[in-house]
């Protein structure tokens, strides 16, 4: 019996959702989100979640599964996603998104320490500041410190958290156990100028859809200190609401920071030779992707 996983990845604003909907409808399959912010409820416009209408077309999973005050670990994401994949392999489920580590955890079968978040420990570590935390990491887990950027607070805290809970460096608890089922990885890309244009259009559309109002509502409900408010788009709108930026300045900053983020995503995904790349602007995109899927997974046109 034919079975396999279809991955659609690439930088933000490259059309992953639209392509995924086309393929999933043709295969009568499901879409599993691989986006680290779309897991959170109420953070909708700024995370470019599929619209309710799009979600009505095809079953979507791992969207709106967490309270914004919660933290979803990579291990928890991997467990949830892998369970969905295993149950739907014969329908060729689609894993879709731009969070490279989420996708890597599945396609590489990453071995991830099952250490639950430790709020008190994190609070104590955060009080030390990122610079001191990174210095501690260099002492207790040199290997991890060489892989983690000095300014990457999330990964630094996680590495220290695992070390203090288990007594073993996270680098010694990691490895890979790739799945045995077939996987086709489809990457979407376009020229830098086209991506810039798409990001500008998307940002304007978000603002027109009520992005500012979304953030105002979230601040009223949760206060100003949610970690998610430090992420792309939300941080800039928060600065606008606090009078630090005009709305046009916030828009320009969102566009700039999104372009920088997209560049990092491109660099990440380009490092994996198994990804088959397609020009998202091609009028034959869907046909070309289906040809690849048919060739690799034995799908019937």
UniProtKB/Swiss-Prot annotation:
InterPro entries: Dimethylallyltransferase, IPT, P-loop_NTPase. One of its GO terms (molecular function) is ATP binding. Its EC number is 2.5.1.75. The record marks 99 as: Interaction with substrate tRNA. Residues 35-38 are annotated as: Interaction with substrate tRNA. It holds the Pfam family IPPT. It comes from the Bacteria. Its cofactor is Mg(2+). ATP binds at residues 10-17. It is an enzyme of class 2 (transferase). Substrate binds at residues 12-17. GO terms for biological process: tRNA modification. It catalyses: adenosine(37) in tRNA + dimethylallyl diphosphate = N(6)-dimethylallyladenosine(37) in tRNA + diphosphate. Keywords: ATP-binding, Magnesium, Nucleotide-binding, Transferase, tRNA processing. Belongs to the IPP transferase family. Catalyzes the transfer of a dimethylallyl group onto the adenine at position 37 in tRNAs that read codons beginning with uridine, leading to the formation of N6-(dimethylallyl)adenosine (i(6)A). This is tRNA dimethylallyltransferase. It comes from Crocosphaera subtropica (strain ATCC 51142 / BH68).
């Amino acid at each position: 019996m034919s079975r396999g996983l279809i991955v659609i990845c690439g930088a933000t604003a490259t059309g992953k959702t639209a392509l995924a909907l086309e393929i999933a409808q043709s295969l009568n399959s499901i879409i599993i989100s691989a986006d680290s912010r779309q897991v959170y409820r109420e953070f909708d416009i700024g995370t470019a979640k599929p619209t309710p209408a799009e979600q009505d077309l095809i079953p979507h999973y791992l969207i709106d599964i967490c309270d914004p005050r919660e933290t979803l670990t990579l291990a928890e994401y991997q467990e949830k996603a892998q369970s969905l994949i295993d149950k739907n392999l014969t329908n060729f489920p689609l894993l879709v998104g731009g969070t490279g580590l989420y996708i890597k955890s599945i396609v590489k079968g990453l071995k991830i320490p099952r250490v639950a978040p430790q709020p008190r420990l994190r609070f104590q570590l955060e009080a030390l500041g990122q610079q001191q935390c990174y210095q501690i990491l260099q002492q207790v887990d040199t290997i991890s410190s060489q892989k983690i950027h000095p300014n990457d607070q999330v990964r630094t805290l996680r590495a220290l958290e695992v070390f203090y809970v288990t007594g073993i460096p996270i680098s010694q608890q990691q490895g890979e156990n790739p799945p045995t089922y077939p996987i086709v990885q489809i990457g979407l890309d376009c020229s830098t100028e086209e991506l810039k244009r798409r990001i500008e259009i998307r940002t304007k559309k978000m603002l027109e859809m009520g992005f500012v109002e979304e953030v105002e509502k979230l601040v009223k409900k949760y206060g100003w200190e949610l970690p998610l408010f430090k992420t792309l788009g939300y941080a800039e709108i928060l600065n606008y609401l606090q009078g630090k930026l005009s709305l046009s300045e916030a828009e320009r900053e969102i566009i700039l920071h999104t372009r920088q983020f997209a560049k990092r995503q491109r660099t990440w995904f380009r490092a994996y030779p198994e990804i088959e790349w397609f020009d998202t602007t091609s009028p034959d995109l869907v046909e070309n992707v289906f040809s690849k899927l048919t060739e690799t997974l034995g799908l019937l046109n």
